[in-house]
Amino acid sequence: MPSNSTDLPAPGETRQMFVDGPAGRLETLLAAPRQGAPAGICLVCHPHPLYGGAMSNKVVYALASSALQAGLLTARFNFRGVGQSEGVYDQTRGETGDALAVYAWLRRQLPQAPLVLAGFSFGAYVSLKAAAEARPALQISVSIPFGKYLENAEPPPHPGCPWLALHSADDEVVNYDDTLAVLQAYVPPPQLVRFEGAGHFYHGRLSELQQTLLPFLQQHLPA
């Protein structure tokens, strides 16, 4: 599909496209809710590019599916160097630019739509960094890795909107207590949902994850 197509997907349709990013084209999947005009837009960021992260990740898919169910147009995309996206890994700096490029494209299509920024693991950190410029209506962070891959990195600013954080107490990749300490330092802290026994990848718990996300979206988005 041509880069920067201005055609949004029809209701119930999923469409592949390419958005021009800072380092080249970014492979993007747009999905539209089945009924009516979108109530908003949701941009979902995937896990670490150097450890197999991609927009096909099942937690990323679960985030996007929850947003679709809430009536949002959803966008998943591959960071630079992943899948058909151009460029090379850039330690969250370039990836934040990638997220903002997709956000800017979405904003041009739907200038007034409320924005939900969401991400899993590395993608949760990148989406929180992007919030300073994108100014979302809602922020969702799943297993956000403060300091895990990001040595000497300062936590990003508070997104300035209702914020939901989800984390498993037995996360084998991103330590729960370390993340909790950082989250509790924010003013106000995010709403935190602690999972038990879900690990980092929420194996067998994705439906529970979605059941947690959907009420948050429905509560805070305009009817």
Predicted regions and their residues:
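Short alpha-helix in the alpha/beta-hydrolase fold that links the catalytic acid
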Residues: 175-184
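Gly/Ala-rich beta-loop-alpha elbow adjacent to hydrolase catalytic centers
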Residues: 118-127
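Alpha/beta-hydrolase active-site loop
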Residues: 89-109
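Short, surface-exposed "cap/lid" segments of acyl-processing enzymes
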Residues: 35-76
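N-terminal cap/lid segment of alpha/beta-hydrolase-fold proteins
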Residues: 1-37
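Short beta-strand/loop motif that positions the catalytic acidic residue
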Residues: 158-160, 165-167, 171
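Catalytic histidine-centered segment of alpha/beta-hydrolase-like enzymes
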Residues: 198-207
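Active-site nucleophile loop of the alpha/beta-hydrolase fold
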Residues: 47-48, 141-149, 168
